[in-house]
Amino acid sequence: MGFAKLDTHRGIRQGMAEVIYGAGKTKEQILKIAQAMVEEREKTVLITRMSKEAAEYVGASLDLHYDDLSRTGIVGQIPKPDGVGKIVVATGGTSDMPVAEEAALTAQVYGNEVVRLYDVGVAGMHRLMDHIEDIMSARVIVAIAGMEGALASVIGGMADCPVIAVPTSVGYGANFGGLSALLSMLNSCASGISVVNIDNGFGAGYLASMINHLEGRKE
């Protein structure tokens, strides 16, 4: 392919194969890259930020599962979880679910058990407390929120595991497209919180998987 160079050894180096970032690529380019990865014996191919049009085009040639909400495509089967523990993906609101599903599906593609806790934001603390057992038993937590982004700080003050904070662009004017949530998360008083870019569910899911596999893979 003249337009792309596959990193066929990434799985060997990092334990996780290359991902296709669909935004900015034509449907033809996405298909050719995915086909090349399948030919290189990749059992599962993850495609992020994929349009529905591209999904229909690729799906006509490959075994593709497409998630409309997160605009994520998966060629092949999601593997059996082999991570050490569970990854919890929590959102402040229902509006954060597109980013959350990108994170959750990414983690699942890389062999992790994922627990989804959606719409458990700080406006109703009881909703979060109803899931305290899930939070305290997690190996790593992905906390996703827009508005003021307080969810990550609250979870970070409760959990004894790493928390990956994901600011989203959900919110009104002074949210500044997710900047307010990003700054809140970066300035959190709670320890053990790391922050990825605005709406970067993929980055959070990928990092969560790396943490969940630090002690090797579960047999």
Question: Where do the language-model regions lie?
Answer:
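Long amphipathic alpha-helical segments
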Residues: M1-H65
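Short glycine/serine/threonine-rich phosphate/pyrophosphate-binding segments
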Residues: E28-I30, D96-E101, M125-H126, A145-V154, ...
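Glycine-rich phosphate-binding loop
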Residues: D130-T168
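Glycine-rich phosphate/diphosphate-binding loop of Rossmann-like nucleotide-binding domains
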Residues: V84-H126
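C-terminal binding/interaction regions
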Residues: T91, S95, E133-M136, V140, ...
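Short glycine-rich or small-residue beta-strand-to-loop segments that form or flank ligand, phosphate
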Residues: V19-I20, L46, K86-G92, I141-A143, ...
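Glycine-rich oxoanion-binding loops at beta->alpha junctions
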Residues: S70-I74, E113-D134, L179-S180, V196
